């Protein structure tokens, strides 16, 4: 599956921020008292990395015993359907000369159409190209399902498959927390 998504990424390319986005970024830098940069976005935001290279970078910060990088829906879904994770860079500015940018900068870049739309559009194109490939290419579908069945020991319900819910009764008898005011503030 990752090969299919990687091929789609190479076909679509990385996000490209146009002049309007550059102007927004430069305006932010100027508002912070910086000399606006000619090319304010990190070069990494406009580069592709193979799944293997991206995984190696991600694993640098994980203990060797940790299987998954996060505890989100993605890791859960990999047990129920063939899945590939990919990242498309959100807009990020090159480092400021006198320390980090305030946190509002990242939030602003994620909410301004000129700066966030290239990321969203690129991700949508990658998803679309990948889905079309799977719909049109039976050999690719068969390869993806074979990998899924190997990884799960036979697919859903297979020998190494992990069920979505706990294999024990859920602990539903906990009391609802009572919030109280203490000298340290509100606690439960």
Predicted features and spans:
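Metal-dependent amide/peptide-bond hydrolase catalytic core
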Residues: 1-188
């Amino acid at each position: 599956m990752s090969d299919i998504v990687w091929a789609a990424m190479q076909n679509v390319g990385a996000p490209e921020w146009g002049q309007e986005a550059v102007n927004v970024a430069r305006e932010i830098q100027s508002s912070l008292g910086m000399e606006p940069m000619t090319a304010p976005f990190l070069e990494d935001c406009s580069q592709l990395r193979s799944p293997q290279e991206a995984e190696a970078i991600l694993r640098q910060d994980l203990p060797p015993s940790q299987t998954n990088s996060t505890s989100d829906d993605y890791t859960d879904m990999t047990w129920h359907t063939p899945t590939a994770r990919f990242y498309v860079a959100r807009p990020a500015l090159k480092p400021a000369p006198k320390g980090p940018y305030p946190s509002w900068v990242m939030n602003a870049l994620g909410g301004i159409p000129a700066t966030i739309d290239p990321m969203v559009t690129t991700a949508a194109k990658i998803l679309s190209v990948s889905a079309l490939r799977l719909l049109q290419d039976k050999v690719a579908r068969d390869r993806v399902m074979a990998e899924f069945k190997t990884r799960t020991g036979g697919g859903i319900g297979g020998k190494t498959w992990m069920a979505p819910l706990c294999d024990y009764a859920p602990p539903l008898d906990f009391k609802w927390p009572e919030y109280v005011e203490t000298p340290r503030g509100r606690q439960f």
